[in-house]
Amino acid sequence: MEHKEIVIGVDLGSRKICAIVAEFKEGILRIIGTAHQDSKEINSKAIKRGRINSLAHASNAIKEVINSAKKMAGLNADEDRNNPMPHFGEYHPKTKAIVSFSGAYTESIRDVTGVASTKDNVVTIDEINRAINSACAKAGLDNDKHILHALPYRFTLDKQEVNDPLGMSGTRLEVFIHIVYTEKNNIENLEKIMIQSGVEIENIVINSYAASIATLSNDERELGVACVDMGGETCNLTIYSGNSIRYNKYLPVGSHHLTTDLSHMLNTPFPYAEEVKIKYGDLSFEGGEETPSQNVQIPTTGSDGHESHIVPLSEIQTIMRERALETFKIIHRSIQDSGLEEHLGGGVVLTGGMALMKGIKELARTHFTNYPVRLAAPVEKYNIMGMFEDLKDPRFSVVVGLILYKAGGHTNYERDSKGVIRYHESDDYTRTAHQSSPTPHIHSSPTERNLSDLKAPSAPLNTAKNDDFLPIKPTEQKGFFKSFLDKISKFF
């Protein structure tokens, strides 16, 4: 009988929930259904910056999106919901999902090393697996932590640096890795909510990683590139160098803050400020330039829509431009903090919903003057077909990246959120992708190997948690912008 697998990608974003249903058949991954809800349709109590705030509210929102995508795909949306779930853990949905995870609730450890000795003087995937797990154990994470990604970026074999040690002769393999982890409670809550939504988690991928998979070229990753997923309430930065992830950072700024600035500064309710941003947003505007329309009439806060006032269009656009510039300054500081600024031959790539704002690329280029800047949307690659036109949009980079991750878009070697080693036999990602567990995976000519007995135990480590929401620290501003930013800084 012909093997067919259904997989779902689910992006739990700050301002929207997205789902893609894909089918694996005859070595090809084909998208057959998609759905999403934006912030106007999602209960604000459900999800905040990617974190589950209410199991009941979140499960309803996620379930609705997933079922809509299933219906488009011609699947029975209720096939998993008809089974009772008296207790968590007693119910196992038929459908599996790859789910995004917000960088807001992760920490990372850089430059951790692990060592493994070879058998028969040849490096196999077993030795690479043991070296990676050795590094994870050496990181000394507490038992209440969960590793999402362990990402090797450098190998040495008998003290000689090599790009890919697999199959090479040698006795001592050393690996240098970048680890991304979170609290186990976060993972357990995510698992509960997804089961209540009718799917079982197959894997978890941080959103910035998923976005980079969907948008970056192999050349950019090899040269070094900073990929910024610009969302509603967050920006998530991932930096590649030498085709490996070297740095990731969550930044508590997004397009939502432009709306908040407009609401406070123009004395208008938030929903109207959002409409103003969408209708009149143009980040290419600079003070003193002529605009098509000089004034805009907007409702006044506290008047229940019965009173309005006039504001210059130039003021609206200047407010948004100043906040966007401040966002790029924050992103730039994070790039500098990474120590990798001199390794960005591929420049800066912007994706996510905020990247759709008119003039954002031109504004970014005025700030990032030392390297190229481009806007990116998802593209078809890694044996994936059926990309709907609606998905070729920066807003859907993360959810498309989740499916591409399944299709082999992960880095050359990786220990994933399930503790499984994923790898490619060469740097050419169009070739066969492998994983070390017996779980079927989407790609042509899969190789399955069970290395679960090679997992290394965890050891204690006390680490500081990420701040839930960090304040924006603006640089010196002139005129009313300084007063305004000082006034509202406490809100962010």
Curated annotation (Swiss-Prot):
Keyword match NADP: no
Residue spans of biased composition, Low complexity class: 436-447
Compositionally skewed regions (Polar residues) per UniProt: 291-303
UniProt topology in membrane: Peripheral membrane protein
InterPro entries per record: ATPase_NBD, Cell_div_FtsA, FtsA/MreB, SHS2_FtsA
Localisation per UniProt entry: Cell inner membrane
Origin superkingdom: Bacteria
SMART domains referenced in this protein's UniProt entry, alphabetically: FtsA (SM00842)
Main localization of the protein described in the UniProt heading: membrane
GO BP term (any one): cell division
Keywords: Cell cycle, Cell division, Cell inner membrane, Cell membrane, Membrane
Keyword Cell membrane included in the entry's annotation: yes
Region span, Disordered: 288-307, 429-458
Cellular component GO terms, alphabetical: cell division site; cytoplasmic side of plasma membrane
Family: Belongs to the FtsA/MreB family.
Role this protein plays: Cell division protein that is involved in the assembly of the Z ring. May serve as a membrane anchor for the Z ring.
Quaternary structure, from the entry: Self-interacts. Interacts with FtsZ.
Protein name per Swiss-Prot or TrEMBL: Cell division protein FtsA
Origin species: Helicobacter pylori (strain ATCC 700392 / 26695) (Campylobacter pylori)
Gene it is expressed from: ftsA
